[in-house]
Design a protein with these regions (language model features):
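Alpha-helical transmembrane segments and their helix-start/interface "positive-inside/aromatic belt" motifs
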Residues: 1-12
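Select subsegments of transmembrane alpha-helices in polytopic membrane proteins
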Residues: 6-7, 53-55, 64-66, 85-95, ...
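Alpha-helical transmembrane segments
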Residues: 10, 44-59, 116-133, 199-200
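Active-site and channel-lining beta-strand-loop segments
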Residues: 22-52, 146-155
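Membrane-water interface of transmembrane alpha-helices
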Residues: 23-28, 60-72, 132-148, 211-217
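Ordered, amphipathic secondary-structure segments that act as subunit-interaction surfaces
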Residues: 67-116
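Small-residue-rich transmembrane alpha-helices that serve as helix-helix interface/gating elements
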Residues: 123-125, 193-208
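Short membrane-interface loop/juxtamembrane segments of multi-pass integral membrane proteins
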Residues: 150-166
Length: 221
């Protein structure tokens, strides 16, 4: 699909999403839930005007993707992995649009307070996203925006390919950890879940960075 066509299709999705927000906006109470803990319990509230900001995030995300692609110093390489980039844009935009409805679903009683459904939806959704991106990461070509962008990978094509391949494996593992956390978050509690989450994401990121450096110094054959 041509990128311009995809951009306008997603723009329509974002506009319809915002229009639906405006339709339900008068029915919302003055204070709405805005944050949930790992257990699924609401632990943050804000004025209902907050939901309008949430509704705008998908469109802002879409615009950022379009701008980033054009200003990247290696923007010509985006054509070489266009399908992967388009998939990323679609997944992020649609996911942000879906997550933006959590406050409304909670207000209208579609998200039970006693369940960890929000944790499953958010953490699980991000986990699936990581797994999908991990499978496609080896196809990403050198750029300054998308993929595992270490200094050594950006300066060497071979290092970039090796780093993206390892990054793909690592993202899949991190995605699996997030999927497990999605269903165990309610049992572990907010603090323990956050610790495991940070350990997985930061640890995975550190390993990718270290691996790229080891390839650079010739330690990884």
């Amino acid at each position: 699909m041509k990128k311009n066509k995809l951009f306008w299709i997603l723009t329509v999705v974002c506009v319809l999403n915002f229009a639906a927000y405006l339709y339900f906006y008068p029915s919302l109470p003055d204070i709405v839930p805005t944050h949930w803990g790992a257990s699924g319990q609401v632990n943050g509230w804000g004025p209902k005007s907050t939901v309008l900001f949430l509704a705008a995030i998908p469109f802002v995300t879409l615009i950022l993707f379009e701008v980033i692609r054009k200003i990247d110093p290696k923007h010509q390489n985006f054509e070489k992995f266009g399908k992967v980039w388009n998939l990323c844009v679609v997944l992020f935009t649609v996911m942000m649009a879906a997550f933006s409805w959590l406050s409304e679903l909670a207000v209208f009683g579609k998200l039970p307070d006693s369940s960890n459904l929000v944790s499953i939806l958010v953490c699980g959704g991000i986990g699936v996203l990581f797994i999908i991106l991990g499978n496609f990461m080896p196809q990403i070509k050198q750029n300054y925006t998308f993929g595992c962008r270490t200094p050594w990978a950006l300066n060497d094509e071979h290092n970039w390919q090796r780093t993206q391949r390892m990054g793909g494996y690592t993202f899949v593992v991190m995605g699996i950890v997030l999927l497990v956390l999605a269903f165990l978050g309610g049992l572990l509690g907010d603090i323990a879940t956050l610790i495991v989450l940070l350990a997985a994401v930061l640890g995975g990121s550190a390993w990718i960075y270290l691996y790229s450096y080891l390839v650079y110094v010739g330690k990884m054959k």
